[in-house]
Amino acid sequence: MHFLKKSIFLVLFLGLVSLSICEKEKREDQNEEEVDENEEASEEKRGLMSILGKVAGNVLGGLFKPKENVQKM
């Protein structure tokens, strides 16, 4: 009976340890996925800001551009 108790406790302990390791790896994988998603979103924002900056530069450049004198005949 004593041998059976030790065996059961050993099996339960090893099962809990392996479950704990699997949960830890799962959390790490989820964190990596979140980091990847955040990096992709950041890249998209940088691209959008670059385009908006160019458009704003063109618009503002057109507004403050000196107008040419046009003479009518």
Swiss-Prot record:
Expressed by the skin glands. The keyword Disulfide bond does not apply. Pfam families: FSAP_sig_propep. Keywords: Amphibian defense peptide, Antibiotic, Antimicrobial, Immunity, Innate immunity, Secreted, Signal. Residues 1-22 form the signal peptide. Residues 30-42 have a biased composition (Acidic residues). Its main location: secreted. It is found in: Secreted. Residues 23-46 form a propeptide. Residues 25-45 are annotated as: Disordered. GO terms for cellular component: extracellular region. GO terms for biological process: defense response to bacterium; innate immune response. InterPro entries: Frog_antimicrobial_propeptide, FSAP. Antimicrobial peptide with activity against both Gram-positive and Gram-negative bacteria. Belongs to the frog skin active peptide (FSAP) family. Frenatin subfamily. This is Frenatin 3.1.
